Amino acid sequence: VTWNLIGERALVIRGKDGKIRAFHNLCKHRGSRVIADDAGTCKSTITCPFHGWTYNLDGTLRGASRPSSLPKLDPIEYGLPPLEMDIWNGFIFVRFQPGPQPALSDILKKFDNEVSQYELFDLEPTGDGFWTEEIDANWKCVRDVDNEGYHVPMAHPGLHDLFGQNYYDEPIAGGLSRSVGSFDSGDGRLWSVRNYKKLLHAKDSLDETHQKCWLYIGVFPNLVFGLYPDSVIFYQEYPVENGKTIQRGGNYKYSKEDREMKISRYLSMRIDRLTSK
């Protein structure tokens, strides 16, 4: 998997040993991008399209073209430049600049007990995996608004019909936040809400409370996880220029999703997309 972020290029790959590693998506020779596709499968090696340097899937240099014209190259020193990487419940995070801050999995550890019942290890992406949307607003404005539920009654008729007054935000120290929308006791005014409540097939591993709520976990500065009884999403914002933002996210379903849960996931998506114009 590759992606670009504000001038940086990242590559995440699983080696033959099954281990996941992250690298800068550039050749150690001249900085050319070694993988052009967004996602795919590398059979055994990665070859730079510029000068033909070849790398093993663990990032080490396998060989350079015309080796007789070059000095002996250490396979680690001249391998793909590594990135700091961390994994939390199957979600992979990379850090372009090493820092003293703790690993994200340590920061999010306070949510582990609650999140464990969602069995995130059983998720698989829907559709093409990731989606992007361009927004004509500064990324900080997008994030500031999304971080508070004060706007929900006016801006999100679907969520307001689903939750009623049962939505609250819980700021947590360390750049974290937790927001919960518990289902209102009524049947619902909107078609999608009425049928979602009627047909909802929640994940069996969830307790009674989490079978009837949507849980959001926010991570400063730009990441949100949405954990629903029928599916899981994430989304984040990246600045492009002043007044323009790219929002990127992913939608996930459970691997053993049956027809009822698929319908529930479809309805929850409809509810989530209902916004005031």
Say what each PLM segment does:
Residues 86, 91-277:
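C-terminal catalytic domain of Rieske-type non-heme iron oxygenases
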Residues 1-98, 102-112:
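Rieske [2Fe-2S] iron-sulfur-binding domain
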